[in-house]
């Protein structure tokens, strides 16, 4: 199992194929993605890689993280993310990763923070049908109906679908296809939409329900190797 990548969502566009058909894609930017630290079985009890995205000013970094970056001798990063990997896929701190880490046609899983929708009713939030339009129903047309039972059990069960805050939660979309890769500009174009707003952070991994692409570099595609 190899590492994923942390990227910034730039927005959506479309790519034209040779036959004239077009494909909607989401453009992701790898802003100086670098290995910050590695977790080992001897020290941490598991194996993983910590990646950093975008450079940060030292004054904006917490004192604890300053020490962390100083220990690994890596320039301070604006965002951090950790990926579980196999022991043979560990990378040294300071290794810069390239967009060539993923190849065209490969299936990936993309995780992001969905857009917040505010307080929403059950018809929008849970796709409820609502109550009757007439036949004695007034004012309550978009309500959820019964909340529970009666004196027994005398409570509302946890997880009951009701009105409440919608969106702004961690969402993973599975089996998206890599439509194009631009190594020079460090761009990855994923077919279709992915969770989150523009400039939001996303995590890209090899699809967990699909076999890894035969041409995908292992353990990773570094900037030096890609160049």
From Swiss-Prot:
Keywords: Methylation, Ribonucleoprotein, Ribosomal protein, RNA-binding, rRNA-binding. It holds the Pfam family Ribosomal_L3. Methylated by PrmB. Transmembrane segments: none annotated. One of its GO terms (cellular component) is cytosolic large ribosomal subunit. Gene3D superfamilies: 3.30.160.810, Translation factors. It comes from the Bacteria. The modification N5-methylglutamine is found at residue 151. The keyword rRNA-binding applies. InterPro entries: Ribosomal_uL3 (IPR000597), Ribosomal_uL3_bac/org-type (IPR019927), Ribosomal_uL3_CS (IPR019926), Transl_B-barrel_sf (IPR009000). One of its GO terms (molecular function) is rRNA binding. Coiled coil: none annotated. GO terms for biological process: translation. Belongs to the universal ribosomal protein uL3 family. One of the primary rRNA binding proteins, it binds directly near the 3'-end of the 23S rRNA, where it nucleates assembly of the 50S subunit. Part of the 50S ribosomal subunit. Forms a cluster with proteins L14 and L19. This is Large ribosomal subunit protein uL3. The gene is rplC.
């Amino acid at each position: 199992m190899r590492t994923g990548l942390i990227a910034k969502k730039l927005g959506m566009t479309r790519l034209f194929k040779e036959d004239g058909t077009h494909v909607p894609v989401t453009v992701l930017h790898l802003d100086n993605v670098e290995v910050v630290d590695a977790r080992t079985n001897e020290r941490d009890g598991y194996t993983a890689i910590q990646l950093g995205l975008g450079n940060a000013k030292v004054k904006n970094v917490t004192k604890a993280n300053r020490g962390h970056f100083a220990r690994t001798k890596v320039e301070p990063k604006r965002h951090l993310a950790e990926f579980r990997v196999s022991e043979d896929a560990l990378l040294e701190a300071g290794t810069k990763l390239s967009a060539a880490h993923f190849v065209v046609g490969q299936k990936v899983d993309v995780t992001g923070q969905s857009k917040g929708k505010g307080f929403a009713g059950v018809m929008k939030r849970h796709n409820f049908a609502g109550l009757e339009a007439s036949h004695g129903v007034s004012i309550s047309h978009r309500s959820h109906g019964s909340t529970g039972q009666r004196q027994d059990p005398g409570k509302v069960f946890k997880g009951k679908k009701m009105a409440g805050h919608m969106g702004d939660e961690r969402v993973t979309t599975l089996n998206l296809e890599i439509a194009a890769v631009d190594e020079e500009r460090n761009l990855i174009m994923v077919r279709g939409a992915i969770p989150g707003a523009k400039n939001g952070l996303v995590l890209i991994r090899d699809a967990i329900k699909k076999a890894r692409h035969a041409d995908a570099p292992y353990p990773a595609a570094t900037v030096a190797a890609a160049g």
